[in-house]
């Protein structure tokens, strides 16, 4: 069995073995994920292999394992727009290669402090795509340099590339396939097979954690997979 196949099976098993009846004081488990939830009242449900999230404020959902070497992350995601209170067509975002310069190899050391507040992620080194950000007006790629936090704010997260055309903004209730690849000292970001972003990396700069980043919206997330390429 390949590592990527194992991750897919683990994802499904974590959901399938959840109890069908949940007492009022109990919550289903997010399994291999850590939530940093600004609101404290983020709601999620798990149906078969799909995670549904209703997010009142900022939320980062970190995959617990730190990824190293050459790898590909892939998943499907949909912005739900059915008239709900938090159904907002904006911010289908993600982090990858995330690290905390003050706590090398221990990204979750300041998880409670970050608490889903977007500015607090300026303390990290990472790669970031904000797809359909600014109320679905922009799709942007940035690289964060957390070492400049409280030193030089203008150098923390330079913009690498941006789209503003409708073809590269969000559509309601549409499923998207996301592929993030780190390989041969380069990273790429693809949506439905189209490469939107590419960036050369220094050796080891692609190592770190993946995080799904959401803001005041309602999403469905499934088919999460990690494939090690080396």
Residue ranges and their predicted role:
Residues 25-230:
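Extracellular glycan-recognition regions
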Residues 1-26:
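Bacterial Sec-dependent N-terminal signal peptides
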